[in-house]
């Protein structure tokens, strides 16, 4: 089994190193091949997603991704900025389903900004569609307004759109995920205002006829954002579009105490996927050895489970992470009084020892 390892920028190389360390500690050995991406790709090959990196990603059975982005690239034209690498990978590999778990570990309840009784036992899965919506809809741009009260003035515009096949395929993925959990699925939209959202809701209802064992409900995105902060444990699996999912998954991540704990998976129709931590590249702490590698290590566990069908090995890694937390090890972002505060490499070593 071949894994493409794309560390990226900022803290990416540090946290990916620890995930690779954990993978190498397993009984089964994998072929790991590394390539530059993001700002590192631009520096090495003049593009955030070099041809050789894309070729490796296509040939691999799965991709372990760090993070991309750095302020020093903000002056580049948009097509050359590091963030275009992840968008390009999603497009070329046809990764359309993003899984973002939000789990509050018992040992980290006090790290959450919410009261312990609100988050104890929290276990949410957000399924986000990745390829459509306003992020990719055309036309888009800046122009002179053709009409309206400010006709002739400059305006920016984007297009929110979804095709029926796009909505149906993410619906099936979400319903199947719900079948494996509590058999509850919440679809989040803004159908009281947006035609695209009403279209989304209608298709969700239609697809639900194929999943009689799953209870489908609906919620407007503004209410969902409020309810995530007010009573998050009412949710199990949430399915939503690209933009709403982007926002809600970041909100849900903070309920757990630290975004540094949360993995994610982006899958194609055959479960080949790209696995990355939910957090960004954090260039302000890059090279300091203090970043939390657990989200990346847990992303490696998701990689084993979903793309390589190695559920037992994935379980081992997840149990090891829980053991490390029970032993009191903490990086700075999840540190609490009386804990054993450690750096990036020491946390990786602790997980390997727990294996």
Swiss-Prot record:
Stated name of the protein: 3-isopropylmalate dehydrogenase
Q: What job does the chain carry out?
A: Catalyzes the oxidation of 3-carboxy-2-hydroxy-4-methylpentanoate (3-isopropylmalate) to 3-carboxy-4-methyl-2-oxopentanoate. The product decarboxylates to 4-methyl-2 oxopentanoate.
Q: Where along the chain is substrate bound?
A: 90, 100, 128, 222
- Report the EC number(s), separated by commas if there are several: 1.1.1.85
State if Amino-acid biosynthesis is listed as a keyword. Answer: yes
One Pfam family of this protein, by short name? Iso_dh
Q: Which residues bind Mg(2+)?
A: 222, 246, 250
Q: What class of enzyme is it?
A: oxidoreductase
InterPro entries membership: IsoCit/isopropylmalate_DH_CS, IsoPropMal-DH-like_dom, Isopropylmalate_DH
Main localization is cytoplasm
Q: Which family does it belong to?
A: Belongs to the isocitrate and isopropylmalate dehydrogenases family. LeuB type 1 subfamily.
Q: Which gene encodes it?
A: leuB
Q: What's its catalytic activity? A: (2R,3S)-3-isopropylmalate + NAD(+) = 4-methyl-2-oxopentanoate + CO2 + NADH
UniProt xrefs under SMART domains: Iso_dh (SM01329)
The coenzyme or cofactor needed here is:
Mg(2+); Mn(2+)
Q: Which GO terms describe its cellular component?
A: cytosol
Which amino acid positions bind NAD(+), per UniProt?
280-292
Coiled-coil spans are: none
Kindly state the subunit structure of this protein. Homodimer.
* Cofactor binding: number and manner: Binds 1 Mg(2+) or Mn(2+) ion per subunit.
Entry-linked HAMAP family: LeuB_type1 (MF_01033)
- Give this protein's Gene Ontology molecular function annotations: 3-isopropylmalate dehydrogenase activity; magnesium ion binding; NAD binding
């Amino acid at each position: 089994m071949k894994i493409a390892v794309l560390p990226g920028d900022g803290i990416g190389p540090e946290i990916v190193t620890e995930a690779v360390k954990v993978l190498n500690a397993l009984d089964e050995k994998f072929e790991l091949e590394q390539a530059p991406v993001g700002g590192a790709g631009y520096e090495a090959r003049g593009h955030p997603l070099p041809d050789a990196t894309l070729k490796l990603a296509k040939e691999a059975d799965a991709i372990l991704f760090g993070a991309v982005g750095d302020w020093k690239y903000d002056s580049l034209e948009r097509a050359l900025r590091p963030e275009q690498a992840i968008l390009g990978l999603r497009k070329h590999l046809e990764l359309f389903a993003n899984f973002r778990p939000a789990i509050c570990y018992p040992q980290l309840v006090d790290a959450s900004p919410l009261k312990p009784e609100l988050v104890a036992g929290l276990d949410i899965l957000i399924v986000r569609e990745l390829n459509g919506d306003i992020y990719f809809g055309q036309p888009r741009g800046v122009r002179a307004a053709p009409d309206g009260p400010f006709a002739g003035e400059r305006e920016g515009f984007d297009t929110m759109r979804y095709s029926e096949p796009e909505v149906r395929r993410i619906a099936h993925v979400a319903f199947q995920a719900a079948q494996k959990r509590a058999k509850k699925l919440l679809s989040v939209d803004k159908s009281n205002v947006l035609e695209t959202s009403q279209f989304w809701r209608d298709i969700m209802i239609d697809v639900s006829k194929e999943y009689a064992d799953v209870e489908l409900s609906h919620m407007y995105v503004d209410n969902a954002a409020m309810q995530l902060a007010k009573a998050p444990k009412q949710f199990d699996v949430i399915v939503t579009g690209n933009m709403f999912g982007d926002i809600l998954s970041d909100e849900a991540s903070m309920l757990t105490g630290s975004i540094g704990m949360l993995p994610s998976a982006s899958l194609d129709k055959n479960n080949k996927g790209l696995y990355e931590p939910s957090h960004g590249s954090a260039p302000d702490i890059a090279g300091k050895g203090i970043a939390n590698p657990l989200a990346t290590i847990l992303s490696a566990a998701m990689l084993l489970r979903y793309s390589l069908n190695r559920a037992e090995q994935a379980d081992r890694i997840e149990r090891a992470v829980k053991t490390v937390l029970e032993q009191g090890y903490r990086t700075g972002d999840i540190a609490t009084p009386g804990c054993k505060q450690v750096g990036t490499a020491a946390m990786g070593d602790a997980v390997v020892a727990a294996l």
